[in-house]
Amino acid sequence: MGSDRWKNIGGTPQMEDSAQEKTQRKGCGYILCTVLLSVAVLLAVTVTGAVLFMNHYHAPSTEPPPVITTNMEDPNALVTIERADSSHINIFIDPNCPDPFPRLDGLQSALLSALADHDSEQKVAGGKERVLLTSLSDQVAQMVSQVARQRADWEIVKKVQNGLGAEIGALKNEQGRLIKLLSEGQSHVVQLGSSVSEVLETVQRELGSGRPRLKADLQRAPSRNSRPRGCANGSKPRDCYDIYMSGQQEDGVYSVFPIHYPSGFQVFCDMTTDGGGWTVFQRREDGSVNFFQGWEQYRDGFGKLTGEHWLGLQRIHLLTMQTHYQLRIDLEDFENATAYALYNTFGVGLFSVNPEEDGYPITVSDYTGTAGDSLGKHSGMKFTTKDMDNDHSENNCASFYHGAWWYRNCHTSNLNGQYLTGHHASYADGIEWSSWTGWQYSLKFTEMKIRPQREEN
């Protein structure tokens, strides 16, 4: 009994030790299952997150996304992932662990719901992108249509501009033709006037009241030492030639009384050059008078008769309207060389009812002399000043060349230009007579004067 008791006593600890070992082994198993289950869940979440990350950030692919499902065929597999190439990834759990499927079903449902939401968001985003692309496409179409309309409008404007250019060209051609016709008409009028004058002179000679008899009577007038202002028979002189024929044959200032201006005005008479009897209407000699004047000054005259002066366009017109006049221009350079130009036909505003409105056009022809013809090309032109542009140039020739003259486009002579001393660097803006000294030499002395055409006895 003692022995049995010993066995019992000794055996009891062994039985208690065996139960304790079972309990420890069972606790370790639960811990191990829990750890494995946690690892499996974490692995499933990680794989699912990786798949979602790849679906969200990677470029679009034609391959279908992996399919995540529970494996009904293998009860030990927690999750099965099927790839596009039909391969599978199974996540297993220990069969000795407690049943985790109720919790895993919830996790699976949540994962599938997240995937569905992600797909829905992608579909919504894709729909928005399609709407945006459609809107952009419509806007681009509208812009293309607008550009097409603008191009069509531009083509229309271009055609209109081309048409206007052609019309302007035609108008310019017509203007040139009209100017040519007017010039030819003026020449014909001048010729007609000359013919009429010749007829009148013929009639005068036939009636016995011609100028030759008057000249013979005047040549028997008082001697040149006497200085009465007027003709010997008491009639008023019309110009310096009448004064000369009355016996007053010294240079100086005299009064003349044109037919259409009986109150008269004073002029300077050149009684020595080429037989005398010249009425001076322009002189340049020292630059003391500014000839860059306006229209009114050139119409009425300025300066001093005994020095530099311009008699005035209106007075020149009144003188040359009386009979046929010739023009003499005397020139001198700074080397004291001299030359002259003689025009047997000269007049200002000969065929004008209102010469000022017509611009006091010049008529000049029949050149002889030593200076060359630098005025003939100006015949028929109106007078231009810095404030009255009557020339054919786009610019005002008077302003451009600092003078006043019967400019065309622009000049071959400029006797009312700046008083410069001989050669100058500027172009054609001095006292120029191009046929004698060119366009860059300003003359020292000029004198323009008129006298009735001389008649043979």
From Swiss-Prot:
Gene3D superfamilies from the UniProt entry: Gamma Fibrinogen, chain A, domain 1 (3.90.215.10)
Annotated segments matching region Disordered: 1-20, 216-235
Spans within the Cytoplasmic topological domain: 1-33
InterPro entries in the cross-refs: Fibrinogen-like_C (IPR036056), Fibrinogen_a/b/g_C_1 (IPR014716), Fibrinogen_a/b/g_C_dom (IPR002181), Fibrinogen_C-term_domain (IPR050373), Fibrinogen_CS (IPR020837)
GO cellular component labels: collagen-containing extracellular matrix; extracellular space; membrane
Residues with site note (Implicated in ligand binding): Y401, H411, Y427, A428
Cellular location(s): Membrane
Cysteines paired by S-S bonds: C240-C269, C397-C410
Pfam families, per database record: Fibrinogen_C (PF00147)
Membrane topology label: Single-pass type II membrane protein
Keyword Metal-binding: yes
Broad class of the protein's primary localization: membrane
Chain positions recorded as Ca(2+) binding sites: D389, D391
Keyword list, A-Z: Calcium, Chitin-binding, Disulfide bond, Glycoprotein, Membrane, Metal-binding, Signal-anchor, Transmembrane, Transmembrane helix
TM regions (residue ranges): 34-54
Keyword Transmembrane: yes
SMART domains documented for this protein: FBG
Residues that carry a glycan: N233, N336
CDD domains tied to this protein: FReD
Oligomer and partners: Homotetramer; disulfide-linked.
PANTHER family tied to this protein: FIBRINOGEN C DOMAIN-CONTAINING PROTEIN 1, FIBRINOGEN/TENASCIN/ANGIOPOEITIN
Protein name: Fibrinogen C domain-containing protein 1-A
Originating organism: Xenopus laevis (African clawed frog)
